[in-house]
Curated annotation (Swiss-Prot):
Family, similarity comment: Belongs to the RapZ-like family.
Species for this entry: Xanthomonas euvesicatoria pv. vesicatoria (strain 85-10) (Xanthomonas campestris pv. vesicatoria)
Positions with a binding annotation for GTP: 57-60
Source lineage: Bacteria, Pseudomonadati, Pseudomonadota, Gammaproteobacteria, Lysobacterales
Stated role: Displays ATPase and GTPase activities.
Ligand binding (ATP): 5-12
Taxonomic superkingdom: Bacteria
Molecular function terms from GO: ATP binding; GTP binding
Pfam families per record: PapZ_C, RapZ-like_N
Record carries keyword ATP-binding: yes
Keywords, comma-separated and alphabetical: ATP-binding, GTP-binding, Nucleotide-binding
Protein name: Nucleotide-binding protein XCV3122
Length: 282
């Protein structure tokens, strides 16, 4: 997966999302080094077993037009190299730079921010025209962008059902894209144990605490029964992906635990495309 686009448009968020899904990632890689990078990662490993994500942009200081030639050569060797291009409106980019107080990569040329954005659009146009998908992030927040990357690009082939298990805090709202929503607030709350309060549902202490609660076992078994019954039917209905969300008060303990537990069960059941996303933690 090749990730490119305008500075401030969400490329770093996309790369971090791929990394969280066990892609081997490299950012700011010059195009001329891309063939050697891919060869080094594939050496001794079947092509189908490797998931790579590479960030390429104006910082690469290389001839971006070379990318088309490399992608064509890679395809002949059975390597699928998809190019995602992230962009946003000038207004959105200017606001993001104002909020973060970061400098634009082209500011060293003595350009004001609007001029730097315009210049970057010109420099990256060869990449945009090659892109398999152009993603406008002007109206997306970080959580929405991560979810879109996971569901539309990171999980793989669309001829099979991809599962995303998500945790969230009810006080911040239910994820609009969720297909199934389960309320984990009925479960015992580790928050009230001072030793467990700083931890999350991914930590062993919280897992052990909840694993030993009878209500948690009963709750989990009933959800497993529901998902094992209906997810195969959704796959037969040609769905590409399903989001299963678990909510609790703070999105830190119970919801995270349940999302991780159900994702683990799905992998054990043989579902090939499974990911987790913890909205309040990631």
């Amino acid at each position: 997966m090749i990730v490119s686009g305008l500075s401030g448009s969400g490329k770093s968020v996309a790369l971090k999302t791929f990394e969280d899904l066990d892609y081997y990632c490299s950012d700011n890689l010059p195009v001329e080094l891309l063939p050697d990078f891919v060869k080094s990662r594939l050496r001794g490993n079947p092509i189908g077993d490797q998931r790579l994500a590479v960030g390429i942009d104006v910082r690469s200081r290389s001839d971006l037009t070379q990318l088309a030639q490399w992608r064509q050569a890679a395809q002949e060797y059975g390597i699928e190299a998809r190019l995602l291009f992230f962009e946003a409106s000038d207004e959105a980019l200017i606001k993001r730079y104002a909020d973060t107080r970061r400098r634009h990569p082209l500011s060293h040329l003595g350009l004001a921010l609007p001029e730097a954005i315009t210049r970057e659009r010109q420099l990256t146009e060869p990449l945009r025209t090659q892109a398999d998908a152009v993603i406008d992030t002007s109206t997306l927040n970080v959580h929405q962008l991560r979810r879109r990357v996971v569901t539309e690009f990171a999980l793989g082939s669309h001829d099979r059902l991809s599962l995303l298990f998500e945790s969230f805090a009810y006080k911040r709202g239910v994820p609009a894209e969720a297909d199934f929503v389960f309320d984990a607030r009925v479960l015992p709350n580790p928050h009230w144990d001072p030793e467990l309060r700083p931890l999350t549902g991914r930590d062993a202490g919280v897992r052990d605490y909840l694993d030993n609660e009878a209500d948690v076992q009963r709750y989990s078994a009933q959800i497993v029964d529901l998902l094992d019954t209906w997810l195969p039917r959704l796959r037969n209905d040609t769905r590409s992906y399903v989001t299963i969300a678990f909510g609790c008060t703070g999105g830190k303990h119970r919801s995270v635990y349940m999302a991780e537990r159900m994702a683990r069960h799905a992998r054990e059941q043989g579902w090939p495309e499974v990911a987790t996303f913890h909205r309040e933690q990631d």
